Amino acid sequence: VSRDRECRVVILTGEGRGFCAGLDFGGYGSAPGFEWHGKVEQGFAVQRHIASLIPRLRSLPQPVIAAVNGPAAGGGFALVLGSDIRLASASARFNAAFIRIGLSACDIGTSWLLPRLVGAARAQELMLTGRIFDAEEAGRIGLVTDVLPDDALMDAAFAKAFEITANTPLGVALTKEGMWSALEIPGLQAAIDLENRQQIMASFSDDAAEARRARTEKRS
C-alpha cells in the first residue's frame, strides 16, 4: 500500500457487524523463524510481530481513516487508536479488552496512544477497568471526531477521504509524518525545526508548483 501511488487514503472498517474484536488466539500461530525456540522466546516474537502493526500504520504515507462500524476491542481498539482520523457509527463499542483476560491493558501501543487522545486520567480509567463504552461517549471524550447513523458511516468516511485528496500527495504525507513526529518529540522548538524542513521540501515539489498555478488561475 505504501508504494501504491494510486492509493491516496486508507479506510479501515469491519466486515459484517463488528469493526475488530481483537486477536484470534487460537489461530495466530508462531512468528516466522522462531518455531523451534522456547515458549518465552516464541511468545515475545509473536508479541513484537503483533505490536509492529501500529508503527506500520504510522509509517504509511497515506492517512488512515478508521470507520468503526461495531465493536472494537483489544487489538481492534488499538487499530482505532493508531489511525489518523476516527469516525464511529452509532452502534460502535470500544474497550481495552486485554485486562479482561488477565493481561495488561498496555498493549499494541495503547498506553501511549490513548492518553494522547483522551487525556491521562480518562485513559487510566478506561484501561484499568477495561469497561465497554459506546460511540456517544467516544465522541464526547474526543476519541472519535464524528458519530454517525450506521447507514451513513461509510459515506462520511469516503467524503472525508475525498476532502483529503483535494490536497497534494506530498503535502498530505508530510503533514501526517509531521503530526506524528510532533507527538513524539519533546518540545516546541524541535517541532518547529521539523516543520521548517518539511515546508522547504514541499515548496520545491512539482505538486506545490502546480497547486500555486491552479490557485493563481482560479482552477480547482
Predicted regions and their residues:
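CoA-thioester-processing core
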Residues: 53, 57-59, 67, 73-127, ...
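Well-ordered beta-strand positions
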Residues: 85, 125, 129-131, 137, ...
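C-terminal long alpha-helix characteristic of the crotonase
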Residues: 87-92, 144-193, 206
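A short, well-ordered alpha-helical element
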Residues: 1-8
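Glycine- (often His-adjacent) and acidic-residue-rich active-site loop
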Residues: 6, 14-56, 102-103, 186
